[in-house]
Amino acid sequence: MTLDVADFCCPEYITEMVDRVKRSWIERQGLVGVTTMVFTIRRDGTIVDIRREKSSGFEVLDSQPERALVLTRSLAPLPAQFPNQTLTVHMEFDYQR
């Protein structure tokens, strides 16, 4: 799992976010591919605007990251030192055999 969050201030927040999403993601599917998702985290930690940015080419692989993000639903509020009201995240879900 890799992600792009530009120049985000707080690496510990990112670590916790990845851990929370990974707990809901079914990583082993017997196929190889990468699905890229984009979503927004609101100031209160709510995950919104979940969408597929790039398909793996396999619906079974593409549906799992969305499911993981929906199940995660919310995270800790964005850190006080982060100045924006939202954080846009581009996350790759990498499936390997």
Spell out what each predicted region is:
Residues 7-15, 56-63:
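Soluble non-cytosolic domains of exported or imported proteins
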Residues 30-59, 66-69:
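Short tight loops/turns at secondary-structure junctions
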Residues 2, 15, 35-36, 40, ...:
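Residue-identity detector for threonine
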Residues 3-8, 23-31, 66-97:
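Short, positively biased Gly/Pro-containing turn/loop motifs at secondary-structure boundaries
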Residues 16, 20-24:
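Solvent-exposed, charged/polar functional surfaces in cytosolic regulatory/catalytic domains
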Residues 1-2, 52:
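Short linear capping/connector segments at secondary-structure termini
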Residues 13, 50-51, 61, 90, ...:
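Solvent-exposed, well-ordered amphipathic alpha-helical segments
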